[in-house]
């Protein structure tokens, strides 16, 4: 996979029959942080309640503290900050189309393939980033580790240096807990002020927002193919006067590529999230607009087309010796095996 073509949707990791794709493991990096003097705080993605069904934030914090973390907070706190910024932008009517910028994979899709739509992408940091800044404002010397179901978040943390210090997947966390013989105990506690826990579901951002700006239609779109179709409609002037919640994963974050592989029940996952979310916003201290703003620039893609011999060599390295081995990865927009080798 060529990095400047990739949008980090993670579908190659999900569908590859040879398990050829591996995700960089940051557990050792986090262990080094924990061995230092600074407090290390976890920002836990709201999809955790789906991945670890029936295990609430209090129980997660107990387990993570045994690993050495200072404290555990919900990324949904940052989501509350972000959705409030979206509301303010819509109220100002500065632009007739606003696309949510929570999903780093969607952001990359627009930055690389739809530069004319960039002006509609909300210039707001992601919930992960907003929460990390909020934590560091309250605990100035803290290190922040995000834990969630997303491959793209590792790239987002690396690209925007100094905000999030490390990213772990649920799978990495689960394996680490098993190594230390730490068991997660069942138990959840309902909190009325926790509406942003809805964020990892399709339409979840919309459900947390005040949808009362006259003249705007509020839409939720998930899945890369549907996002591409919507972005083409925007380019062609078909869509206008709307706020679009856009997620690259079908089902939004609870359909993330590194939700643990044994855990593939979208209806149950959705119900876990909805039943855990409250009806009111978290109590948060808002960050100033400058701190939470984020600029997105066009990313130029440059490719040199390999020769036929080079393509065949690449396919052999991938273990694709026969035509039957040449899986058509249509989910990630590869129409033929030789094109797969090219990228």
Question: Which residue ranges define each predicted feature?
Answer:
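Single conserved hydrophobic/aromatic residue that forms the stacking wall/gate
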Residues: 332-343
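Short hydrophobic beta-strand motif reused across regulatory alpha/beta modules
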Residues: 12, 21-22
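Domain-start "cap" segments at the beginnings of catalytic or binding domains
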Residues: 1-3
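A structural motif detector for beta-strand N-caps
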Residues: 15-16
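Iron-sulfur-associated redox domains of electron-transfer enzymes in respiratory
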Residues: 24-332
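Terminal amphipathic helices with adjacent charged low-complexity linkers/tails
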Residues: 5-10
